[in-house]
Each structure stands twice: as structure tokens, then as C-alpha cells.
């Protein structure tokens, strides 16, 4: 049986070699976002999991995207959000391996982070792990 932390690390390692990581200017983490970061960071977290031979985990892969400044006004960097989301979809949409399966739990969405002039692309996925232990 796997724990939430083990699944976070598994998901982290799956994402680590992807084009998504190569395209952001920040870091990839499974222990939280660096304090005060203004970069495009990717944070992996698992919210809940079940036990049994097929364990299902609800996980979030959040990508933080700073706003752009347009004539002194802080605006959503929508073109960057679209670009990064387009890299997420093939990564998380019905991926299957011998050890686990990943699929979206809900459509990826950009959420405004109040007070810090950035948005978060929330990828809520379900990772199902085949427990052969």
C-alpha cells in the first residue's frame, strides 16, 4: 500500500522529465512552493487516497503564473496560461503505465491568487496505483 507522500514523489518523478518542467522558469516541488517566489513554479500535492489493490489518489498539480504588467495594471498572462495548460493535457489526460494510471478529475482551470498578482493553473487529477505488494 502506498501513502500520499509516496504518490506525490511518484507523480513528481513522472513530471520531472517532461516538456512542462523544461518550459517553466521556476521549480518543481512536492514539498511546497518556495516562499516569496515570483516564478512559474509547479507544486504537486495529494489530497486523499484509498486503500486496496487499486488505490485511487486525488492529486493537484498547480502551476503558478505571474501576471503581466500592462500600463501599470496587473493582468492575467492568458497566453502563458494557455501555453502551459496545453502541455499539461497530454501529460495528465488518460496516461497509463504498468504501475499507475492518471486521468483528469476535472477540467484544468486558472484560479486567481488574490493579493499576489498571479494565477494558478489547477490540474486536479486522479492517480490510480496498482498495489501488487
Predicted regions: what is each one?
Residues 1-24, 45-133:
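Charged, amphipathic alpha-helical segments and their flanking helix caps
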Residues 37-46:
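A short, hydrophobic beta-strand-centered structural micro-motif
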Residues 27-38:
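Short acidic low-complexity segments
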Amino acid at each position: 500500500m502506498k501513502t500520499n507522500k509516496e504518490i506525490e514523489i511518484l507523480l513528481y518523478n513522472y513530471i520531472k522529465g517532461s516538456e512542462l518542467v523544461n518550459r517553466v522558469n521556476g521549480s518543481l516541488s512536492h514539498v511546497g512552493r518556495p516562499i516569496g517566489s515570483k516564478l512559474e513554479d509547479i507544486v504537486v500535492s495529494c489530497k486523499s487516497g484509498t486503500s486496496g489493490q487499486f488505490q485511487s489518489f486525488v492529486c493537484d498539480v498547480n502551476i503558478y503564473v505571474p501576471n503581466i504588467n500592462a500600463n501599470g495594471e496587473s493582468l492575467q498572462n492568458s497566453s502563458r496560461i494557455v501555453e502551459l495548460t496545453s502541455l499539461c493535457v497530454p501529460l495528465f489526460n488518460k496516461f497509463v503505465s504498468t504501475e499507475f494510471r492518471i486521468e483528469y478529475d476535472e477540467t484544468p482551470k486558472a484560479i486567481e491568487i488574490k493579493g499576489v498578482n498571479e494565477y494558478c493553473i489547477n490540474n486536479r487529477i486522479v492517480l490510480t496505483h496498482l498495489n501488487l505488494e
